[in-house]
């Protein structure tokens, strides 16, 4: 009976892992869907916040469908969203993993536009775009860590408090960034039973 109670009450599973992932990786082994995010709140006006969100390998859900890429496998798509409170036209991009995405030794390269280099506790995130570019050095902190694991290791989620330092360029203006944020990393198996 205790087994079923533990499956229902998952609160015991929080923070039951290493303090941070040893290495961020792309699709590997049974983990086919990889999520990375950087969230920096409380930036001065007109920025207010900065969000970076990537999903490498798509779950089989219509909301993630990228038919314009002409890809038959949802797992071969990577999507990236970078936004601030300022109006931005090019904040969302989808990439063909086979042709526009490269992963090598903790370096995630999304067609040269967004590049994430992670050698924890140090991370560097750059974005080269005509409208919104940035260069950030990120250091994860020992405080403010959270880990959650789905039953049977179907998925894992890390959230790490971090200090961000760098610059953001938008519409000819340069904005310095020196702020705390949150770095997230998650991985899961491909839940192939989701309706398409």
Regions found by a protein language model. Give the residues of each.
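Structured soluble/peripheral alpha/beta segments that form catalytic or ligand/cofactor-binding pockets
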Residues: 1-196
